[in-house]
Amino acid sequence: MGAGGDKPKTTSHLKTPACPYPIYSNSISDYGLYGYTDAPKIMNESVTVSARGTIGYVCLRHIPYVPIVRLVTLIPNTDILSAKYLYLFLSHRNITGTGTTQQQLTVPDFSKTEIPIPDKQIMTSFTEIVTPFFQQIWANEEENEKLTEVRDTLLPKLMSGELDVSRLDI
């Protein structure tokens, strides 16, 4: 368990070959995506929890990334429990912080959270059952990204008349 650090030196607002790894912050919009960078800090499937502002926003991360700015990162010991189980458990809890002016969640506070751990066979079966659902979600998200890119490329060309579609039989 750890807290997100400073923003990396090399960043881009767009995903590029030089900056292919997402940077996540404690925001709730766009799953907390802040930008992209050239080197990930977290390589394993993990769970992040926003720790300031919108406290308790839980995300399952399955690709290498960099956590920044008040984002608690949980990398489970996969011999004991899966990130998918941890994500589903935490996403159904009311996670709160401490503080009077601005609520915040600290790693020491969060480490007190009790997580029921089923035996290994049940955990393995559970993970095998839910994995295809997550894989489908991730495939859909990837397809949405590609479709957004196509839309953003084609729409300006259609609007400017650069791409003529008047002869299409629709």
Model-identified regions with their sequence ranges:
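DNA target-recognition domains and sequence-specific DNA-contacting regions of bacterial/archaeal
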Residues: 1-118, 169
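Amphipathic alpha-helical coiled-coil/heptad-repeat segments
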Residues: 79-81, 92, 96-98, 103, ...
